[in-house]
Amino acid sequence: QGWQPAERTLGIVGVGHVGSLVKAYAEGWGFRVVCCDPPREERERCGFRPLEEVAREADILTFHTPLDASTRHMAGSRLFGRMKSGAVLINSSRGEVVDGEALLRSGLGWALDVWEHEPNPDPALLENALLATPHIAGYSEQGKANATAMSVASLARRFGLPLDGWYPPQAAPAVPRPISWQELCRTIGGAYDIAAESRRLKERPGDFESMRDHYAYRREYF
């Protein structure tokens, strides 16, 4: 889009592990960041904002929420009507968090990794996405290793197995590191060409599930 962080407001919906990392990096890059996380706000009173306020101020609105009765279609026509003209919505949480039909009518831009009706995303939603990927945001080497380690830890607790701290030996845990906006823009394309990934999915939408099943894991970039 040619945007610079200092000129833009990033809205984050869901400030758990991933959302917190997004917040930390975005603030470091110079974005103005506004956050919404009602469960955390109720528990911690940490100054998070209501969803509609965040949506109204955001140039980019990104979702990092679980899917339950309270989040299904939380991004729908009412919310879209409060967003800025030309704003961009990003969803890498669960497809049903966003009402796809309403998004098509919204006039917004969107970048989606998750979709309603997977593995058969709406053709118009797919074709008109700024970026489209086949639900692979967590498909890094470390992401898969973390999920495996969590499963092992859960089984170990359930059955009393001596596996505290176990982690797949083939994968080194990712350690977040500072990275400037300039370095990110200059180098990330060499680590992961998301534009090429998006083109492949748009050209061959019927391969959605196959692309996931045969995805080559990448190391986390930062």
Give the predicted meaning of each segment:
Residues 13-16:
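Glycine-rich Rossmann-fold phosphate-binding loop(s) that bind the pyrophosphate
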Residues 19-20:
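N-terminal Rossmann-fold NAD(P) dinucleotide-binding loop
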Residues 23-27, 84:
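Surface-exposed amphipathic alpha-helices with a cationic face
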Residues 40-124:
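Rossmann-like adenosine-cofactor binding region
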